[in-house]
């Protein structure tokens, strides 16, 4: 069972629909007991970092997520969910994240139109069970104004270019992040979710 954490930050219906297509049983929840019982966790989200962290803390789920991560449970963060994994965001202030990954979030370069919205290609940075080894620059769907700006280089699986390097897929142990929306990224996005679920079994 996959627990999709619902802290009021969107894109859950399309994500659950994508998982249903893969015959993956998921529940949408804010209950600590259900999250702890799940085989894996997905932290989705769109919107502001500060608001998301406040909602997660009010639900007392920050410590639950951190504890489950420490136990080795697979956790996938999508879009804002991926950004919440990091230590810090400089989005309209200086905000503390979940600290599951080292690094920080900053606004995308002012030289390009923000938000970064629409289809963009992925540049594969290192081999992973998530990809076919012969994969050539697939297109995925992004919607974001902030991006990971500092990170551990060995966690970067794939990136995109939009005025700067955009970390698009990161992974460290049981923690995986996707800055784009796999559930909105066509056949490749569905294949990514499928391979992710196969990888964490």
Curated annotation (Swiss-Prot):
PROSITE patterns: GATASE_TYPE_1
EC identifiers of the protein: 4.3.2.10, 3.5.1.2
Pathway involvement of the protein, from the record: Amino-acid biosynthesis; L-histidine biosynthesis; L-histidine from 5-phospho-alpha-D-ribose 1-diphosphate: step 5/9
SUPFAM superfamilies: Class I glutamine amidotransferase-like (SSF52317)
Gene Ontology terms: biological process: L-histidine biosynthetic process
Domain Glutamine amidotransferase type-1: 1-201
GO molecular function: glutaminase activity; imidazoleglycerol-phosphate synthase activity; lyase activity
Reaction equations catalysed: 5-[(5-phospho-1-deoxy-D-ribulos-1-ylimino)methylamino]-1-(5-phospho-beta-D-ribosyl)imidazole-4-carboxamide + L-glutamine = D-erythro-1-(imidazol-4-yl)glycerol 3-phosphate + 5-amino-1-(5-phospho-beta-D-ribosyl)imidazole-4-carboxamide + L-glutamate + H(+); L-glutamine + H2O = L-glutamate + NH4(+)
Name of the protein this chain belongs to: Imidazole glycerol phosphate synthase subunit HisH
Native source species: Oceanobacillus iheyensis (strain DSM 14371 / CIP 107618 / JCM 11309 / KCTC 3954 / HTE831)
Organismal lineage: Bacteria, Bacillati, Bacillota, Bacilli, Bacillales
